[in-house]
Amino acid sequence: MADNKRIVLAYSGGLDTSVAISYLKERTGKDVVAVSLDVGQGGESLETIKQRALACGAVESYVVDARDEFANEYCMKALKANAMYEGVYPLVSAISRPLISKHLVRAAHQFGADTISHGCTGKGNDQVRFEVSIASIDPTLKAISPIRDLSLTRDVEIAFAKEHKLPITQTEKSPYSIDQNVWGRAIETGFLEDPWNGPTKDCYSYTDDPAFPPVEDEVVIEFKEGVPVKIDGRDVTPLQAIEEMNRRAGAQGIGRIDLIEDRLVGIKSRELYEAPGAVALITAHQELENCCLEREQHRIKRDIDKRWGELVYDAQWFSPATQSLNAFIEDTQKYVSGEIRMVLHGGRAVVTGRRSDSSLYDYKLATYDSGDTFDQKSSNGFIDIYGLPSRVAAARDVKFGNGIEVPKNTVE
């Protein structure tokens, strides 16, 4: 039976969720259990975050080391889908919310809570991601957000934190909202809300300035069925692969993203991201797919990848549609094995070599030199058949006076 005196809170250690603990206690009279996940975000130690939750009034606070789970089951799905929302954003925050939601539901079951709370505002995507994910796992649980439901602004939150002496470092002079994990880092609010303002150096943490790179870094990444398994000949787990590429690509300033983004809630927002490891790995994975996927399969997968990214961005990780797309994507990866060589330098990850036993690239068919096995005479019949619909349609257009106009000869 649910204990109505307890609420499970998704706790990040930041301003919104620290304020949420006190607000929940004051407004509901219920005890708050704070849940924090280690998804490779680094920064403050989890012990520090745990103690802060307790200092802010949580009755219990515990953390879950979910780094390998996040890398294996979430980042790798995003990698196989070459997930880039609107062509540039590798879903840094979007893929972590379903994992966090799963552990929140588990904690709610463990502690007998009937309510899960988060610290999201009413303008962001994450409120939708948390609540839709929670409902997809256990529709009997209630989800609330004191920050959103009370329409609290950031300056009011800061004042509340000061008044209640909550141990947070955020100030009115440094009001950035940062979300980070091993897949990347998101920075928003503050002066960045004016889209004309350029990012300053203090915005960045995962990447160095690409204008002043160190010497170029050559790396060879080996994939097995779409998953990185070796870097420069050394065995790596997915987590280790992401972490190493974060360091190496980040040192070269790779993965800085600055865009106006279409949010799920219907507004446009200015977003700043750093995702050096994700960008480098996706670049390598895409090139290996270029070698290993059959043409029509590849064309369809590019469409599927785009739709997968949109669904996951739009809080549909657990939806039937996403699960069906996962099945297609996973099937395409059975031959995506091989090595990609890249040069990392000055903000760019450039592929310089690729090899795979399952590659569909056939040198003898592709070469223009001696040894060419492509029968060029076959092209005549192919063109006749391929161009037949165009010829028939053109004849019809000419008949009705709608043929394509050709410029008259003006040469005298």
From Swiss-Prot:
Its main location: cytoplasm. PANTHER family: ARGININOSUCCINATE SYNTHASE (PTHR11587:SF2). It comes from Bifidobacterium longum subsp. infantis (strain ATCC 15697 / DSM 20088 / JCM 1222 / NCTC 11817 / S12). It comes from the Bacteria. This is Argininosuccinate synthase. It is found in: Cytoplasm. Homotetramer. Its EC number is 6.3.4.5. One of its GO terms (cellular component) is cytoplasm. Belongs to the argininosuccinate synthase family. Type 1 subfamily.
